[in-house]
Amino acid sequence: MADSGHSISVTFPSFHSGGKEHIIRTGCGSVSVTVCGDQEKPPLITYPDLALNHMSCFQGLFVSPESASLLLHNFCIYHINPPGHELGAASIGIDDPVPSIEDLCDQILVVLNYFRLGSVMCMGAMAGAYILTLFSIKYSERVTGLILISPICKAPSWTERFYNKLTSKTLYYYGMCDLVKELLIHRYFSKEVCGNPEIPESDMVLACRKLLDERDSVNVWRYLQAIDSRRDITEELKSLECKTIIFVGDSSPFHDEALQIAEKLGTNCSALVEVHACGSMVTQEQPHAMLIPLENFLKGFGLYRPCRYSNSPRSPLGPSSIDPELLYPEKMGLKLRPIKLRVSPQPRAHKN
């Protein structure tokens, strides 16, 4: 794949103040990257699931004061959007070659080289988790650690292929219609928030439906084609050298695959967090459930929440402000596998 030649930078109204969008040209099309935070800090890259961008996939986590203080204190965030999934994206030409899952993986290398990043922390959800895991297998020296949300590792099952085919054909001929939105909503969320004849949908799901209306159907179709052509990387997981934490809702259609990934990685360098009554998108549905496991995971890299947040009574992280349930994860329905981390290469040095 050809390396990036040029980039366009524009001010971007993000849920992080000061975020800037960069459009980076790669050998298989352009990719949008929104950079948030101090670029002198260690980098964390994110990659979302099908039909989502960084805001609709990760906003719940990053707008939480507790999680935001932990992540933005320690990292500069590079939100990578799938081609054509950024806000206001134009429709990619129907005759343009559809990138493979390997192409999307290699685009990440172009992004890292463009920003002159060395080893990065990675956070991905569902299809985005697959792409970042594949990237970690291919370019292990460029990955410090993995934060995976409802990850997948196998080729599509017959059931998934059926739904992908249905979604693909409907997108192609009818666009982002109600059927497609319904299929995607149940991919993302648990029945607890999707509603029923007696209980209305949650505001979160209603907001997601509205965001899906803004997605370009051709661009979503192209991402789906790449996802549907993925290969099984289960056996290659054994070669992963980086520390990994996995979050998965027990109602996620990818729950079993997430457990299999955790089993393949073993407990020496991975941790599994199962969230009760939650779908695939833990970052949106139950972001508070990620806080303590994330904090413990990042401690293995020498990273921490800033003292000024954790000790100040005015801070959202002050003891009087923390929901008592956060101190006792089992009360939130979390099943935690002990985090056993062995020594491995540390993230890029923090520059003062």
Swiss-Prot record:
Any Pfam family hit: Ndr
Taxonomic superkingdom: Eukaryota
InterPro entries: AB_hydrolase_fold, NDRG
SUPFAM superfamilies, per the entry: alpha/beta-Hydrolases (SSF53474)
Tissue distribution: Pollen.
Protein family: Belongs to the NDRG family.
Name this protein carries in UniProt: Pollen-specific protein SF21
Native source species: Helianthus annuus (Common sunflower)
Gene of this entry: SF21
